[in-house]
């Protein structure tokens, strides 16, 4: 007898000890042992009294009918005992129940029509199972579609789920604001009964009371909620919850009082005003205006994955959910015909670029706090809530900062902001997509050139890493698009008084330099209309310059330029050949028979001007030598050959950007040589490491001392790690070399022009003898770099597909390493 008393006391003490351990921080091994002991203790107490569980689960009666049923079933259950006799335990032991919430949560329980027994279990209500469920569009989901949940399929609709059961984890209910078994709508339109708990501003949904990890974990801060009352054909009250960064959640509740109670708790947790709770007067946050512009559509295509926590769920585009939903049983022909139309009108998540603020967990004094974070003007601002009424801490300047992912087993999506190695802040996102979005935002604002693929993501699987990288690249691209440089074709012309640079850093020839003093002495017209008409736009249809206008022709008739041109034409031989065609452009300044005449022209010709060609893509000018406005004059045969050569070389250099091309070729060549030299060094180091590895393996085979053997194995592991690192660096180097080679080929082929090139073919193929033309009968000169010339220009950028194999290999290596 004493043995049984000692065993009973041992079990009691063990139960108390396990409860004490629940309050302690234990290691993973200790947690496993504790859970094993708790399970053994539960099994022992359950097997020692088989009728205890039944009596306990049916002791709470609502009316006399249920009480009579329980009394009728009790003898039948006792008759099934192995020994044919009732058990020794006649009454159920007192089990610890979860703490009740504050009294303010249940003021309206007194208004219930059906009187209920006042008991602690009465607080946890449950939704009655439904026979059929109707979607928002009135289509009944086929009842033949079986649920994926075995418990729902076997027990869900046969008997109500009593709470709490003896195996229920009371730990789940600790510090909970409200909890109950509710119906939750799945993405196929079916309903699943789950244990819903609101704790620490989060909604937790458990598949059953035995589970320790929630199937759904959503932060309710900033979320909106709508109460949809029970309709005629429906059997449930609905609460539609729209979180900030998760899918829409629909909960089914049994009574209006329960729905209003949950609505009030969710509104208190979310921090939103309660005025917009009723349907039709919904309070929608700013972020939802971008993401959910059609709330009714969003409810139709709910997505709550049953294969993992939806904290890391990736929201699907409405059209994909539409296809999944319409493919269920009982769909109509009209729905199939409308699938294509819905795809065309569905909203793409393009507004993602506008989301520069959301809730993040911030590490403050070794504690994680939820803060509303916003990126604005290269600063990261922290607020207590989304209303931005109270600043949580001082803004953080992002200029020059580094953003480094810092995942841990407990915080997979955490990252740090560093400045010169010093940690300024540590943040945590709620999903892989949100983490990637914020990485891209912070990298863009800090001005960092780091590729998101270069980061190391420990404790994160390959799928989530790819999601983080793709989201980061997407936000980077959208931020670059948002803050891109102004486009001249859209933003209009630049200001007139701005100093514009030359197209290229090309040294002009001595001939052009000799004309510059005359340009300085030239009186520039102040009329803005003349300035506007002086530009020849390369991407438009060629128009006449103001030099060909009647007013300008009259103004130039009395200028010394025409007298110089007349002198030049009179000095030419009488049997001059046919002049150039009107398609040929005006060439350089009129040259006489000798250099002395050219020098004498300089002080006498103050009206010579350098025409400019406006390139809209980069808002730059190309300087050309003075050209004749109304007459086409070629270089006379008696002119010195060096003048012609300098003329052609200068034009070619201006056209091709010779100095820039040579500089790019030189730079890429040096970069290629440097990378190849580094590659050879890595190869030599790898060969040496492999040699040492072979020698170590041979030594390991011959070694018999255990201590020496352990040290050799450790050294071998270190060499293996070093080999992997060197191999990874070699792969990166190969990719860099491939990129440099491609750039070098492009540079050698010619400069990557800015959408235009200066065509000087006409300058080199000028007829040796000009035709003297009077100003009255001057033909129209086609502007240089006209649109027709540009169409015939060959492509200077060749798209290549090389290097993809190495790129794929690198991606697979990174996925394998993670």
Swiss-Prot record:
Occurrences of domain PH (ranges): 175-271, 353-447
Region (Disordered) location: 66-163, 513-532, 765-787
GO annotation, biological process: inflammatory response; positive regulation of DNA-templated transcription; positive regulation of epidermal growth factor receptor signaling pathway; positive regulation of interleukin-8 production; regulation of interleukin-6 production; regulation of mitotic cell cycle
Major location (coarse): cytoplasm
Gene3D superfamilies (alphabetical): Pleckstrin-homology domain (PH domain)/Phosphotyrosine-binding domain (PTB)
SMART domains: PH (SM00233)
Comp. bias intervals (Polar residues): 85-94
Subcellular location: Cytoplasm
Modified residues (Phosphoserine): 408, 484
Keywords: Coiled coil, Cytoplasm, Phosphoprotein, Repeat
A single cellular component GO annotation: plasma membrane
Coiled-coil blocks: 652-749
Matching InterPro entries: AFAP, PH-like_dom_sf, PH_domain
Tissue-specific expression: Detected in spleen and thyroid, and at lower levels in kidney, brain, lung and pancreas.
Post-translational modification Phosphotyrosine, affected residues: 56, 413
PTM comment, free text: Tyrosine phosphorylated (by SRC).
PROSITE patterns: PH_DOMAIN
Function according to Swiss-Prot or TrEMBL: May play a role in a signaling cascade by enhancing the kinase activity of SRC. Contributes to SRC-regulated transcription activation.
Assembly and interaction partners: Interacts with SRC. Interacts with LCK when tyrosine phosphorylated.
Protein name in UniProt: Actin filament-associated protein 1-like 2
